[in-house]
Amino acid sequence: MPSTGAALVGALLWAMAMGASALTGLWLDNWETPEKIRFVVLLFAMGAAIAFPVGLFAARLASLDRHWEVALAAAFVCLLAATLAFTGGLFALQYRSYYAEWHAEAFTVRWAFELVFTSLTALYQFVVLGVRLYFPLGFIALAAASVWFARQQR
């Protein structure tokens, strides 16, 4: 079980790293709208902050009483999956809230279809357009966090 301090400090550092990665990607793409840049960076940072404790817990669970190689792989996979899942989920919520204005009344069959397909479209767009913002800094931070985790397990 990860300590509360490690989870909180790690979440803060992970959020800063993923936010910096998104900022670098947007800067390299020559985005010119500061409010949109701030929103995307905040989205990536919030997703990372929520994901880190979950990914850390899953990695510890997967690598319990195993060799350091397993701990390294578990941290890599669990942090990657949690970060993508939570950031993609936040993106889908924002995407859904934007398009909700044109959707049917809540809790109808049509609304349910619109909710599902809007969310799936948002996740698809995040995978296609958003994941690239994790390269190169996010990938380097992921490797560093995985090595840190594996060393902690020794």
Where are these regions (language model features)?
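Alpha-helical transmembrane segments and their helix-start/interface "positive-inside/aromatic belt" motifs
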Residues: M1-G10, H67-L80
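Canonical alpha-helical transmembrane segments
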Residues: F44-W68
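Membrane-interfacial helical/loop segments at transmembrane boundaries in membrane proteins
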Residues: R96-T121
